Amino acid sequence: MDDEEETYRLWKIRKTIMQLCHDRGYLVTQDELDQTLEEFRAQFGDKPSEGRPRRTDLTVLVAHNDDPTDQMFVFFPEEPKVGIKTIKVYCQRMQEENITRALIVVQQGMTPSAKQSLVDMAPKYILEQFLQQELLINITEHELVPEHVVMTKEEVTELLARYKLRENQLPRIQAGDPVARYFGIKRGQVVKIIRPSETAGRYITYRLVQ
């Protein structure tokens, strides 16, 4: 892939990551959300083949709006298929900086042992894997994807009381659903899904993540 195309891809991927962090409630500046390709080139370079930028230059650290101590890393490993050695390096950095959550943007996936290590480290350390291909577009901006809102525990309690329901009576959504992964929704959380409706203005459904 030539430098121009690769620079464009890295810009798109990082832009989606910034939107994802923002949508999860982390503090991202408007400038970062609106960064143009020209601004990306000026900041990081436009010769990936010569290490400008290297993928590691794109690392992001964000803090949550509600709790500045709740921080999240986004790592961009250099190697196409990520092995356990890289995961250990990331985990060590997270331990040193007292950060328990990270996203890893991979080019071609992970080795089986690296994948298993993510499972073994949870729930103390939550590392989520995204293929860069998934991040070239922001799935939540697709016109066919309705708005998803993660509900607080208080909102869920109120919802169940209002409709006299038990949580296990709610319809389900899989934790591996692409939109659920985008928002980092965990099993047991409830999502409010808002669709436009010609008759009612909007149509709301609720889903329990499983």
From Swiss-Prot:
How the protein assembles, per its UniProt entry? Component of the RNA polymerase I (Pol I), RNA polymerase II (Pol II) and RNA polymerase III (Pol III) complexes consisting of at least 13, 12 and 17 subunits, respectively. Pol I complex consists of a ten-subunit catalytic core composed of POLR1A/RPA1, POLR1B/RPA2, POLR1C/RPAC1, POLR1D/RPAC2, POLR1H/RPA12, POLR2E/RPABC1, POLR2F/RPABC2, POLR2H/RPABC3, POLR2K/RPABC4 and POLR2L/RPABC5; a mobile stalk subunit POLR1F/RPA43 protruding from the core and additional subunits homologous to general transcription factors POLR1E/RPA49 and POLR1G/RPA34.
Localization per Swiss-Prot or TrEMBL = Nucleus; Nucleus, Nucleolus
User: What broad class describes the main subcellular location of this protein?
Assistant: nucleus
The protein's matches in PANTHER family, at most eight in alphabetical order, are given as: DNA-DIRECTED RNA POLYMERASES I, II, AND III SUBUNIT RPABC1
Q: Per the record, what is one GO cellular component?
A: nucleus
Q: What is this protein called?
A: DNA-directed RNA polymerases I, II, and III subunit RPABC1
Recorded source organism is Pongo abelii
| PROSITE patterns in alphabetical order | RNA_POL_H_23KD (PS01110)
What residues bear N-acetylmethionine in this entry?
A: 1
Give a yes or no for keyword Lipid metabolism in this entry: no
Give UniProt keywords alphabetically: Acetylation, DNA-directed RNA polymerase, Isopeptide bond, Nucleus, Transcription, Ubl conjugation
Biological process annotations from GO = transcription by RNA polymerase II; transcription elongation by RNA polymerase I; tRNA transcription by RNA polymerase III
Mind telling me where the Glycyl lysine isopeptide (Lys-Gly) (interchain with G-Cter in SUMO2) cross-link is?
81
* Task of the protein: DNA-dependent RNA polymerase catalyzes the transcription of DNA into RNA using the four ribonucleoside triphosphates as substrates. Common component of RNA polymerases I, II and III which synthesize ribosomal RNA precursors, mRNA precursors and many functional non-coding RNAs, and small RNAs, such as 5S rRNA and tRNAs, respectively. Pol II is the central component of the basal RNA polymerase II transcription machinery. Pols are composed of mobile elements that move relative to each other.
The record's Pfam families line, in alphabetical order, gives:
RNA_pol_Rpb5_C, RNA_pol_Rpb5_N
Q: Which family does it belong to?
A: Belongs to the archaeal Rpo5/eukaryotic RPB5 RNA polymerase subunit family.
Query: Under the GO molecular function aspect, what terms does this record hold?
Result: DNA binding; DNA-directed RNA polymerase activity
Q: Which domain of life is it from?
A: Eukaryota
